[in-house]
């Protein structure tokens, strides 16, 4: 079945949660240990994490979850045009210059010469903010998931080719396998399932036994942030929004959203490390980690097809069947190709342009 055009799934002008995934070319292990050649490219996962931090600080897009594996990576993103709407023209110009600078400075990182954005001059900022057409185009790009993926994949590919001593047009050549895959998340149930699916990638691949053991994932950073707070005797009542700007998860969207008490509106980030301070699920951080821990241990101890036991009580509050939801997480990658959600959400959803129903595989 042909893959849907991006315009049929989501639009930068609307708030949308999306799961995206990109694979390295020819199933090569270009982000980890390649057993065939003996080369280890694990350090490239750090490149991805560093770039994610830069993108999260400048795009109008929330980074909800991520996982870097040896031949692919997963992200859960939420476009926030409402946050972009709160930025004045100067802020829009500054952010775009930081993402796509016309001038760069060279710094040495891990033995490599890396280009970083130079500080823009007033003239360079004026070239953007004094052009209404260009400014409107850039505002749209800042909440566009496709532009996020374009800059991320391009950066990693060019840096990897430079490391190999070649140019993008020759030598190592293409780094990524075609287009990135995208699945729109239609409801809270699918959003929680997708975040868990992404965070538990190392556990399903038998690379890690528990969530604490995983590396290069958003859950690892959330656990590290909580452990740091405990070690520093920080109050348990502290909000994830008020954590240190140096916390390991400072560039990630907060987990918890309180629909009753949280203020309305976009809630742009106060730290400048991420797009906004708005959470994405009605769970406390500890409850989310409890669910992931339950799933990870169930995956490790249960036989194929068996039902996980001792489900966290939070499922009752969310009105989610833990057995059905656990199966959704387990089969997420195979079941959902364009959109994800419960039966009612998928049945009522239509493609944006042609107004057709979405296809969902039976697993």
Task: Describe the function of each predicted region.
Residues 1-363:
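Short catalytic/metal-binding and nucleic-acid-binding patches
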């Amino acid at each position: 079945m042909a893959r849907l055009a991006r315009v049929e799934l989501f639009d930068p002008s609307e708030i949308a949660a999306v799961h995206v995934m990109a694979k390295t070319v020819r199933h090569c292990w270009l982000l980890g240990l390649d057993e065939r050649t003996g080369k280890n490219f694990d350090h490239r996962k750090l490149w991805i994490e560093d770039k994610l931090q830069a993108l999260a600080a400048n795009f109008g897009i929330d980074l909800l979850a991520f996982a870097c594996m040896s031949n692919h990576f997963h992200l859960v993103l939420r476009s926030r045009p409402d946050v972009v709407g709160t930025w004045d023209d100067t802020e829009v110009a500054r952010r775009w210059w930081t993402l796509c600078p016309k001038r760069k400075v060279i710094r040495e990182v891990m033995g490599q010469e890396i280009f970083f954005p130079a500080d823009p001059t007033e003239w360079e900022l004026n070239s953007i903010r004094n052009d209404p057409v260009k400014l409107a185009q850039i505002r749209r790009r800042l909440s566009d998931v496709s532009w996020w993926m374009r800059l991320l994949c391009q950066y990693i590919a060019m840096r990897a080719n430079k490391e190999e001593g070649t140019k993008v047009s020759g030598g190592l050549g293409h780094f990524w396998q075609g287009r990135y895959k995208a699945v729109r998340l239609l409801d809270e149930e699918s959003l929680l399932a997708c975040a868990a699916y992404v965070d538990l990638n190392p556990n399903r691949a038998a690379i890690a036994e528990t969530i604490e053991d995983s590396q290069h994932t958003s859950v690892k950073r959330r656990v590290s942030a909580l452990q740091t707070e405990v070690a520093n005797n920080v109050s348990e009542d502290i909000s994830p929004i008020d954590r240190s700007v140096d916390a390991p998860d400072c560039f990630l969207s907060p987990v918890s959203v309180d629909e009753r008490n949280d203020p309305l509106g976009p809630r742009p980030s106060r730290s400048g490390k991420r797009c906004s301070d708005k959470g994405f699920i009605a769970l406390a951080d500890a409850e989310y980690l409890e669910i992931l821990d339950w799933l990870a241990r169930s995956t490790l101890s249960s036989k194929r097809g068996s039902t996980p036991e001792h489900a966290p009580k939070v499922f009752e509050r969310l009105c989610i069947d833990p057995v059905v939801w656990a199966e959704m997480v387990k089969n997420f990658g195979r079941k959902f190709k364009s959109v994800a959600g419960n039966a009612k959400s998928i049945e009522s959803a239509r493609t944006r342009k042609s107004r057709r129903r979405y296809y969902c595989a039976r697993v």
